[in-house]
Amino acid sequence: MTTDTIVAQATAPGRGGVGIIRVSGDKASDVAMAVLGHLPKVRYADYCDFKAADGAVIDQGIALYFKGPNSFTGEDVLELQGHGGQVVLDMLIKRVMDVDGVRIAKPGEFSEQAFMNDKLDLTQAEAIADLIDATSEQAAKSALNSLQGEFSTQVHELVDQVTNLRLYVEAAIDFPDEEVDFLSDGKIAASLGKIITKLDSVQSSAKQGAIIREGMKVVIAGRPNAGKSSLLNALAGKESAIVTEIAGTTRDVLREHIHLDGMPLHIIDTAGLRDTTDTVEQIGIERAWAEIETADQVLFMVDGTTTDAVDPHDIWPDFIDRLPKNLGVTVVRNKADLTGESLDATDEQGHKVFRLSAKTGSGVDELKAHLKSLMGYQSNLEGGFLARRRHLEALELASSHLALGQEQLEVYQAGELLAEELRMCQLALSEITGKFTSDDLLGKIFSSFCIGK
């Protein structure tokens, strides 16, 4: 870990009412003596002059001094809060760097120091960047919950439960004559079942948190000329796709990134799905299926003039049977302006069915509201947390180890192999909070932060 003292502008570049310079490290007190002429009282706001080496006043403002470990980074920290002119702030940084041993901070280095000094775990550090980047009230609140440790607490609870069960299993292994009794008395199976249930719950919350942070991928799919491109244009609010009466106009994947009340949504328009001998169209259809397989939700676009059916299995059973398991499907009966259908939404065989006209826009707002609800918009605004792709991958890995461990217990009565799967599960979960994390991953995470954070 670095022993350098670091400095950076903590406020955004450019003009502003207030500009803040942050200093962290052993030399923070030396910087205070050089720039202020005295060391401010710890945790008190001190209004004073910020001076150049020759004693000339660079600016006037408030100095705050925090003695480590009682600071954000866990080190001595000095904050100089002055006027927000960029020239003044640059002059002040240059003055701070006159002190030997002080250098410009790397992106995210203040947060990295806080992590290294156990002031934050990795999910809390990531939440700082997510809070800054939040595009909706929901995302901001969820990021704040993560910063306050809601996600970390749930992960720590899981790690503790896995660790305790592992110790119990290893104790059984230490007494080989009694190992079979230990493994078959039901206590281990019950404990393992509770952990799996808890992990499933955390995974579900994390997936919702990832959608709030990263956006939901929605693929519009269906037969040619069902109105898929018209729906893309209606959702995007602009003419993104060419729309004609000719079937097969869309031959490639079209993407639009939009926000619904701040909630990020990735909309994918695809080629119409059908049997064809056209080589180019076949490629487009293959790409359509590739997008469907990685989607969070599919909008199954149906030309309402061709069928009265609302159950997707009745409309096109082969299409539904090919979809990935657990992929959400919303049926969109289009061309209500021609069929005269009422613009309402119903539940049919576990699927939401919307009736609308992509051409006129009637009923599209109701579909947008549905998509927002799928992303968790205003759903339990006080709860929830944000999650990243790496968190989901770690939770999935932990879940797979628990499943293998359950198999070792129930099928093979193999205590040592169960203990090993529990150990691997423990490592996967601990990587989320940064207890066991590679330096390469840490570098990648913190380098994406703002300088000064």
UniProtKB/Swiss-Prot annotation:
What's its top-level EC category?
Answer: hydrolase
Any GO CC annotation of this UniProt entry = cytosol
What SUPFAM superfamilies does UniProt report for this protein, alphabetically? Answer: P-loop containing nucleoside triphosphate hydrolases, TrmE connector domain
Q: Where does (6S)-5-formyl-5,6,7,8-tetrahydrofolate bind?
A: R22, E79, K119, K453
List ligand-binding residues for GTP. 225-230, 244-250, 269-272, 334-337
Task: Name the cofactor(s) required for activity, per the record.
Answer: K(+)
CDD domains annotated for this entry?
trmE, TrmE_N
The protein's name is tRNA modification GTPase MnmE
Organism encoding this protein? Shewanella loihica (strain ATCC BAA-1088 / PV-4)
